[in-house]
C-alpha cells in the first residue's frame, strides 16, 4: 500500500514537472474547436493592448503576442483541479468595434472526458469574463 502511494506521488511529480516546463505553443497553433466569441465596441488595436496587458494579474502569464495577426497566447498555472491551460485570444476588426474569440487547451495533452471539458469551459469562461471586465474599464 505504501509502495503504491509512493509510486503515485512520483508519477504526479513527473507530470507536474512536464507541465511546468512546457513552453507556450506557436502563435499560429490551433487550440481546439471549442471557442467563445463576443463583440465589443472597442477598436481591435485597443483590445489587443488590453489582452496583452491582462497577464499583469496574478492569474495569467503572457506566452506570445502578435499584433499583426491580432493574437495573444496566455497561460495559467496548475491548480488542485487542473494542470493549467493555454489560451488563445484572437481579435478581429468588426463593424462598430471588434470581435474577440477565446479558446483553451490543457497544458497536459492526454486529457479527455466530460469532467475535463467542463473544467476547461469554466476556465475559458473565466478568461472571457476577465477580458470583458478589462474592456469595460478601457472604454
Regions found by a protein language model. Name each.
Residues 4-8, 12-139:
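Ser/Thr-rich, low-complexity intrinsically disordered terminal regions
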